[in-house]
């Protein structure tokens, strides 16, 4: 075998193996949490909203009110299956259950510790892993835009409708 050819192959192999791994530097600034709340209807739609900080009962109630109104408008029952989170069972929400049922929105609860029965959890995992992984964001706004874009991309790829609910933000006083 030709020595120059072997030397050339060895050099090529060395060059291939000498690639540097990309480094992402973590910024010193620690941002606030971006929470997402959503309703998924498999292969049909994903309705979601973003909140800086935690999702409170007002945001949850707003989403449920919209779902109840839509159920009443189209005259078709809607069923929401959810976990037993404190927001889902707080006093203010419980008072609205009969109103929502009269509009055609029914709420059922999963047994505790059954995340595998919540398709929305799988959707959030894919959003993080497939659309957001390996990225750094300067602030919460950049992260929010990336989440919005990621949800839209997943909707297009999965051929389902996405709709973002916009919650009123409370201006700082």
Outline where the language-model segments fall.
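RNase H-like polynucleotidyl transferase catalytic core
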Residues: 22-28, 100-119, 136
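Short, basic/hydrophobic alpha-helical segments
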Residues: 60-79
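C-terminal anion-handling pockets and recognition modules
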Residues: 120-173
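A short acidic, often aromatic-flanked loop/helix-cap motif at beta-alpha or helix-coil junctions
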Residues: 5-6, 113-117, 143
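Short aromatic-enriched loop/helix-cap "lid" or pocket-rim segments at secondary-structure transitions
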Residues: 9-13, 92-94, 119-122
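Short, aromatic/basic amphipathic alpha-helical patches
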Residues: 91-101
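Extended, low-complexity cationic-aromatic segments
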Residues: 1-66, 167-168, 173
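Acidic/histidine-rich, metal-coordinating catalytic segments
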Residues: 1-2, 75-89, 118
């Amino acid at each position: 075998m030709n020595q120059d050819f072997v030397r050339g192959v060895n050099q090529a192999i060395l060059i291939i193996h000498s690639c540097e791994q990309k480094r992402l530097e973590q910024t010193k600034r620690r941002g606030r949490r971006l929470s997402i709340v959503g309703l998924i209807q498999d292969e049909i739609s994903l309705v979601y909203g973003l909140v800086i900080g935690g999702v409170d009962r007002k945001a949850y109630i707003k989403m449920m009110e919209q779902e109840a109104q839509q159920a009443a408008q189209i005259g078709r029952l809607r069923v929401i299956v959810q976990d037993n989170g404190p927001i889902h069972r707080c006093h203010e929400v419980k008072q609205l259950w009969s109103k929502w049922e009269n509009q055609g929105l029914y709420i059922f609860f999963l047994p505790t510790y059954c995340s595998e029965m919540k398709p929305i959890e799988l959707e959030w995992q894919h959003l993080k892993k497939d659309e957001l992984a390996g990225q750094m964001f300067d602030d919460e706004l950049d992260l929010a835009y990336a989440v919005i874009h990621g949800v839209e991309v997943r909707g297009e790829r999965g051929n389902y409708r996405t709709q973002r609910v916009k919650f009123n933000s409370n201006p700082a006083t």
